[in-house]
């Protein structure tokens, strides 16, 4: 017979070590051999933090009672089971779960779904995309404003050039039909200044008769008519000079004829347009208005 004693360093020294008494025989008992092998293997695999001391001693030849053997066996087996359970728990703690790539998973986990919907239904990175889009649009707007400003500046300059009056400008101090305008042109590398008469500015003539106001619109004559009149005047002046040399008495008669011709030319360029009469002519008109004095009305 032999005894096997198990004692742990973590147990208190006040308790007595538990002893397991086994009866050895020639034939092997299958019920006892398998658990012993398993427990001895677990004890050998257990970590070094819980070392176990095994002491063997000779037993007396006297056989113990079966009731005492059963009690000691139950206590010893429970102790061995606790040791095996502790060793298995340590192994589970040491073995970590293997990493699995997300591509190998067919279904999405709750965490991945939370990442996809963390910004109120929009995917992650959508804010950055929107900001980039807005930044691009703002840059395009600034470029458009620059191009419009550059295109608007030359148009304004062109307008200024078109609106610029001829140099030198007309004399604004002189008012009436006989205004003088100076024109310049180049001849043989020289600047020639000529004084000309511009077309009349007053386009309307006012005429009051029979209690009504009549307006006459002046139509500007063409350039060829002006040139013809100038040539005629020059020819007439030459003729007058020749006639003056011959007969000085015929000069006043010739001047009267010239004045008549000028009046005829002016009448051709003037067309009288009569507006609709609002006043009542004849005997039915109010004769009280005829006693009033004439008033001058200025319109702009």
Curated annotation (Swiss-Prot):
Expressed in the shoot apex and young siliques. Detected in provascular and vascular tissue, but not in the vegetative meristem. In inflorescences, restricted to the base of the flower and to the vasculature of the stem and the pedicels, but absent from young flowers. Detected in the center of the inflorescence meristem. Residues 30-56 have a biased composition (Polar residues). It holds the Pfam family FAF. It comes from the Eukaryota. Residues 233-262 have a biased composition (Acidic residues). Residues 166-217 form the FAF domain. PANTHER family: FANTASTIC FOUR-LIKE PROTEIN (DUF3049) (PTHR33155), PROTEIN FANTASTIC FOUR 4 (PTHR33155:SF15). Belongs to the fantastic four family. This is Protein FANTASTIC FOUR 4.
């Amino acid at each position: 017979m032999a005894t096997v004693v198990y004692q742990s360093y973590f147990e208190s020294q006040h308790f007595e070590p538990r002893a397991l008494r086994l009866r050895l025989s020639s034939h092997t008992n299958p019920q006892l051999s398998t658990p012993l092998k398993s427990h001895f293997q677990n004890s050998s695999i257990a970590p070094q933090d819980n070392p176990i001391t095994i002491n063997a001693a000779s037993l007396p030849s006297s056989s113990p009672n079966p009731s005492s053997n059963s009690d000691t066996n139950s206590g010893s087996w429970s102790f061995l089971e606790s040791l095996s359970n502790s060793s298995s728990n340590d192994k589970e703690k040491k073995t970590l779960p293997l990493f699995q790539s997300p591509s190998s998973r067919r279904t999405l986990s709750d965490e991945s779904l939370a990442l996809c919907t963390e910004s109120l239904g929009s995917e992650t990175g959508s804010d950055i995309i929107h900001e980039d889009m807005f930044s691009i649009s703002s840059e395009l707007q600034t470029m458009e404003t620059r191009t419009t400003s550059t295109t608007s500046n030359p148009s304004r300059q062109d307008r200024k050039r078109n609106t610029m009056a001829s140099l030198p400008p007309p004399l604004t101090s002189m008012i009436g039909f006989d205004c003088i305008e100076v024109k310049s042109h180049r001849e043989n590398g020289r600047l020639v200044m000529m004084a000309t008469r511009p077309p009349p500015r007053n386009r309307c003539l006012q005429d009051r008769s029979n209690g009504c106001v009549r307006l006459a619109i002046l139509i500007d004559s063409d350039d060829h008519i002006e040139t013809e009149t100038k040539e005629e005047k020059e020819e007439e002046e030459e003729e007058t000079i020749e006639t003056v040399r011959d007969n000085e008495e015929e000069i006043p008669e010739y001047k009267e004829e010239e004045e008549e011709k000028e009046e005829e030319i002016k009448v051709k360029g003037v067309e009288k347009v009569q507006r609709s009469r609002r006043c009542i002519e004849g005997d039915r008109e109010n004769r009280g208005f005829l006693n009033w004095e004439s008033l001058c009305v200025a319109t702009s």
